[in-house]
Swiss-Prot record:
InterPro entries: Ade_phspho_trans, PRibTrfase_dom, PRTase-like, UPRTase/APRTase. This is Adenine phosphoribosyltransferase. Pfam families: Pribosyltran. One of its GO terms (biological process) is AMP salvage. It catalyses: AMP + diphosphate = 5-phospho-alpha-D-ribose 1-diphosphate + adenine. It comes from Stutzerimonas stutzeri. Its main location: cytoplasm. The keyword Nuclease does not apply. GO terms for molecular function: adenine binding; adenine phosphoribosyltransferase activity; AMP binding. It is found in: Cytoplasm. It comes from the Bacteria. Belongs to the purine/pyrimidine phosphoribosyltransferase family. One of its GO terms (cellular component) is cytoplasm. Keywords: Cytoplasm, Glycosyltransferase, Purine salvage, Transferase.
């Protein structure tokens, strides 16, 4: 299936003033209501990574789980979940980070990765980069490597992709929105 950025962008709903005034939230739930759009997103990412040399998919809580699990299944890679604080039942490593909304913690099971593993990080969106940067710090603390950070959407004006690239993490997104896009 050929990727159609226009079709994908029309299914990403802008929600004004959510979760707080002044923020335009990019809601991807309409993508999941369209089997064609979901297949287009998944197939585009699978084509990009089908021959890539990494060992794990690292999916970020919560919307990153949706497509990350499809990628792990289709690419036959183990799926590592990066969860919000307090959601994992066993021993964890934790990393504080800032978001466009405030401060939070990201956690991973302490036995999820081994030294030398290579991880494709996946989230729905790159905004300030806080969540992906925290995931990258956790991966590096486990002496594993980051293959790339990928997402459906980039908000380049918020600088997250650039921050990731500045610390040597390549990024890939299927589409981007300017903050002024409605």
């Amino acid at each position: 299936m050929i990727f159609d950025e226009f079709s994908i962008k029309t299914l990403i709903r802008p929600v004004q003033d959510f979760p707080r005034p002044g923020v335009v939230f990019r809601d991807i739930t309409p993508l999941f209501q369209s089997p064609k759009a979901l297949r287009m997103v998944a197939d585009s990412l699978i084509q990009r990574y089908v021959e890539a040399d990494f060992t794990h998919i690292g999916a970020l809580d919560a919307r990153g789980f949706l497509v990350g699990s499809i990628l792990a299944y289709e690419l036959n890679k183990p799926l590592v979940l990066f969860r919000k604080q307090g959601k994992l039942p066993a021993d964890v490593l934790s990393q504080a980070y800032s978001t466009e909304y405030g401060e939070a913690h990201l956690e991973i099971h302490a036995d999820s990765l081994c030294e030398g593993d290579s991880v494709l990080l996946f989230d729905d969106l790159i905004a300030t980069g806080g969540t992906l940067l925290a995931a990258a710090q956790l991966v590096r603390r486990m002496r594993a490597n980051i293959h790339e950070a990928a997402a459906i959407i980039d908000l380049p004006e918020l600088g997250g992709s650039q921050k990731l690239q500045d610390i040597g993490i390549p990024t890939f997104t299927l589409t981007a929105f300017a903050l002024s896009d409605r």
